[in-house]
């Protein structure tokens, strides 16, 4: 008996499908792993027990800790990535990714030990992804932590061509007796501000709106570089200078100035009943923030609750240690100013005020 012929468009007549046909290129993923191994290798430090490629990354807590407490943090780069796509600049966002997490765990006194990344896209461009991961590795070197693993997710239909998203995960350790939680801060303590390298990684939805309104030439000279370079400057990593400072004197509190600016981040390390009074004249407003404020018509109060306004990290020390801390940080290459003091809060007052 003759078998019925398959219809022209039936599954039986269709050519067999592959994962590549579905939009996932396994070979590209393998090529990326090979491309990034040298970058990751440069970040190796004591404690790493294996290389990239295993199911899990192994790390041994350094023996110098008697009672180690692990401190973890995770973050992304936010809509700064949209500007990176527009400018086709992918060499700085990797450092941004590392900085956002390692600076966060640093404020509790933690030494960053290792970092993992997540790179998600619709179609994997090996060159772009390798550039991003190279920046991640460079950020890890600046922070003294190992890039010990990550995930590259190619998900067709999830992201437009040429776009991707990033997430980072940092783990550090601090001696239990040396955890910094702000509990020792008292009235009279001094608030030191460490300079930011630019906008860092927060406020970019407003930045992009201002650019949309102002329509500037992003390739034009701006304070010794192009406006595009100023806008994409990577987030500063404060780890090594501040870890060194903690070895020299008592740091009572720190605040990484991210989303919410000075007025929302400093209160996170202050006990109830304390207020940090900041003097806006104590440090210069960098030209980039002045440009954003002018072209966006942004009010002073809004600037202080959206942007870092030139201060990327706050350190609180006793008045007796303020000069020494300033000198040590300056010697380590940081720009630092005494930007305020801690005092008792007035009734109904916010925990950080800018005067």
UniProtKB/Swiss-Prot annotation:
Localisation per UniProt entry: Cytoplasm
UniProt pathway: Purine metabolism; IMP biosynthesis via de novo pathway; 5-amino-1-(5-phospho-D-ribosyl)imidazole from N(2)-formyl-N(1)-(5-phospho-D-ribosyl)glycinamide: step 2/2
Domain of life, per lineage: Bacteria
InterPro entries tied to this protein: PurM-like_C_dom, PurM-like_C_sf, PurM-like_N, PurM-like_N_sf, PurM_cligase
Pfam families per record: AIRS, AIRS_C
Keywords tagged on the record: ATP-binding, Cytoplasm, Ligase, Nucleotide-binding, Purine biosynthesis
Catalytic reactions of this protein: 2-formamido-N(1)-(5-O-phospho-beta-D-ribosyl)acetamidine + ATP = 5-amino-1-(5-phospho-beta-D-ribosyl)imidazole + ADP + phosphate + H(+)
Predominant place of localization: cytoplasm
A single BP term in Gene Ontology: adenine biosynthetic process
Protein name (Swiss-Prot/TrEMBL): Phosphoribosylformylglycinamidine cyclo-ligase
Source organism of this protein record: Paraburkholderia phymatum (strain DSM 17167 / CIP 108236 / LMG 21445 / STM815)
Gene for this chain: purM
């Amino acid at each position: 008996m003759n078998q019925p012929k398959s219809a022209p468009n039936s599954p039986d007549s269709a050519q067999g499908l592959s994962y590549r046909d579905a939009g996932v290129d396994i070979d590209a993923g393998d090529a990326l792993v090979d491309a990034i191994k040298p970058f990751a290798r440069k970040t190796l430090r004591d404690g790493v027990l294996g290389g990239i490629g295993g199911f899990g990354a192994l790390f041994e807590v350094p023996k110098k800790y008697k009672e180690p407490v692990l401190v973890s943090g995770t973050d992304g780069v936010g809509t700064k990535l949209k500007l990176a796509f527009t400018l086709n600049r992918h060499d700085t966002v990797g450092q941004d990714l590392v900085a956002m997490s390692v600076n966060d765990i640093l404020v509790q006194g933690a030494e960053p030990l290792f970092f993992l990344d997540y790179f998600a896209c619709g179609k994997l461009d090996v060159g772009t992804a390798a550039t991003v991961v190279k920046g991640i590795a460079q950020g890890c070197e600046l922070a003294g932590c190992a890039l010990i693993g990550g995930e590259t997710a190619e998900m067709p239909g999830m992201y437009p061509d040429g776009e991707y998203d990033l997430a980072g995960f940092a783990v550090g350790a601090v001696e239990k007796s040396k955890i910094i939680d702000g509990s020792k801060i008292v009235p009279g303590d001094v608030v030191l501000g460490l300079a930011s390298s630019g906008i860092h990684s927060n406020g970019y939805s407003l930045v992009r709106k201002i650019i949309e309104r102002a329509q500037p030439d992003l390739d034009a000279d701006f304070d010794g570089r192009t406006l595009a370079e100023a806008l994409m400057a990577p987030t500063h990593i404060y780890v090594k200078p501040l870890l060194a400072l903690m070895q020299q004197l008592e740091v009572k509190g720190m605040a990484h100035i991210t989303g919410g600016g000075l007025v929302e981040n400093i209160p996170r390390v202050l006990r109830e009943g304390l207020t940090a009074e900041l003097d806006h004249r104590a440090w210069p407003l960098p030209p980039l923030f002045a440009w954003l404020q002018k072209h966006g018509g942004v009010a002073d109060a809004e600037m202080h609750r959206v942007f870092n306004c030139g201060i990327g990290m706050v350190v609180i020390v006793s008045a007796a240690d303020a000069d020494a801390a300033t000198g040590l940080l300056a010697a380590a290459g940081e720009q630092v100013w005494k930007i305020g003091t801690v005092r008792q809060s007035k009734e109904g007052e916010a925990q950080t005020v800018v005067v």
